Amino acid sequence: MVRLILVTIITCMLCVPSTFARSFVVPLQANGTVHHIDKDSIQLAGQSSTMRMVKATMAVKSPKYEDIAYITYFYKYDLINRTIQKKPIILYMGTKMPYTYNSPYLDVSVVGSVDYIYANYAYYKEFGSYFSQDMIDRYGSTDLSTNK
């Protein structure tokens, strides 16, 4: 009986945090794919007088497949030219073996695109303000997430 209670407590301790710990941004849809960003994964990855870098993990789910891919992006913010670049690093697809995908940096320049909004959101969560003026004009200081 004691073992059963102990197993139940340990199971709850392992399952409950993994179920409720992650909180996501409002889902955005682009090209038939639903994206979410894991707020808990956003963290500073580096900074200098001319650049800031933020790491964020995204869940990408296609309506065609049951698998969810988890992609870790490094967003590089050029403080002088006011440009954003992204670099996808790791892709996990469902229960398959993870593999590393090391891409070159890609420009995030389409205003209003999913990548643009997420890059600005990651910056907002780390530094308290949006990186791009049009995001400030559009959202003010409003948090885009569903869970404030």
Predicted regions and their residues:
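Short amphipathic alpha-helical segments that mediate assembly, nucleic-acid/protein binding
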Residues: 6-7, 132
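Positively charged n-region of N-terminal signal peptides that target proteins for export
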Residues: 1-4
